[in-house]
Amino acid sequence: MAQRITLHDMTLRDGMHPKRHQISLEQMKGIARGLDAAGVPLIEVTHGDGLGGASVNYGFPAHSDEEYLRAVLGELKQARVSALLLPGIGTVDHLRMAHEIGVQTIRVATHCTEADVSEQHIGMARKLGMDTVGFLMMAHMAPVQTLVQQALLMESYGANCLYITDSAGHMLPHDVTEKLTAVRQALRPETELGFHGHHNLAMGVANSLAAITCGATRIDAAAAGLGAGAGNTPMEVLVAVCERMGIETGVDVFRIADVAEDLVVPIMDHPIRIDRDALTLGYAGVYSSFLLFAKRAEAKYRIPAREILVELGRQRLVGGQEDMIEDTAITLARARGLPVA
């Protein structure tokens, strides 16, 4: 029997990062219709930093989470909608709102060593009867045994699926194999395993295939790779490769390629590719959504973005510390005698 996986689209959530959270409702509805028609079963919709992400730190979106979610939910014929929630950014009130308007899957995301902060949110989601996913970010930063312990914590809180997340696009296939094999062996058989990759070292597809080989049944990807850094695993490429390998996705390769080419590429503010800064993200192991913040700091303080990113990697900054990026740029500028006023 052919192996079957669930592809989870990131275009309308992780894709908000390179769009500075400014995707219009009409653009979002059009892309959602295309994804739905292509057979994508699960589509994530929120601010790039999850429910409640609208802020000075993370950026103000063109519309509220509720407006985006309602717009997409009204367009779908077969796909389900998920929302991301980072404790400390999103609250249980945001979670209840998403559930009340029809979101069926919630993904509760923490840094890979901080699963304990997810207990309230995972517990509430399970109480509401939602498909509840624990999402361990920046997984390259934790040794295997730590990752296993954190995954087991999320499972004990009620998560029915655990994601290992390569937020920096830093992992290589052997890293994925080592970590996902250990987590898969530790989880209950009925608990699903997922993988979220970034393409900063061009490993998105290869890492996803490694994850599938280890027993992952949910894989994140984005049409045309639209996402932070050099983007997420490109959905259309992953679908084509899976089809060649006999892995069933339920997604039509030509329809998803058309969504990427006709709907997603035209709205890009800049090409999603492995430029020197995105490469630095993957090489240094820095959170992918830091890229635009580093580029803004470069323009303001005349410190090359990649030098800022390398320093962030040295400091081991993690998601949620975006406010430290400007501080780092100021420190580097002062060290060189550059004006910071």
UniProtKB/Swiss-Prot annotation:
- Which reactions fall under this protein's catalytic activity? (S)-4-hydroxy-2-oxopentanoate = acetaldehyde + pyruvate
Q: Where is the active site?
A: 17
EC number(s) recorded for this UniProt protein: 4.1.3.39
Q: What CDD domains would the database entry show?
A: DRE_TIM_HOA
Residues at which Mn(2+) binds: 14, 196, 198
The broad enzyme category this protein falls into is lyase
Single biological process term from Gene Ontology: L-leucine biosynthetic process
| InterPro entries associated with the record | 2-IPM_HCS-like, 4OH_2_O-val_aldolase, Aldolase_TIM, DmpG_comm, DRE_TIM_HOA, PYR_CT
Q: Which UniProt keywords apply?
A: Aromatic hydrocarbons catabolism, Lyase, Manganese, Metal-binding
Provide the binding site for substrate: 13-14, 167, 196, 287
Pfam families reported in the protein's UniProt record: DmpG_comm, HMGL-like
Task: Spell out the residues of the site Transition state stabilizer.
Answer: 13
The residues covered by the Pyruvate carboxyltransferase domain are 5-257
Gene Ontology MF annotations: 2-isopropylmalate synthase activity; 4-hydroxy-2-oxovalerate aldolase activity; manganese ion binding
Recorded family membership: Belongs to the 4-hydroxy-2-oxovalerate aldolase family.
The protein in question is named 4-hydroxy-2-oxovalerate aldolase
Please name the source species: Cupriavidus taiwanensis (strain DSM 17343 / BCRC 17206 / CCUG 44338 / CIP 107171 / LMG 19424 / R1)
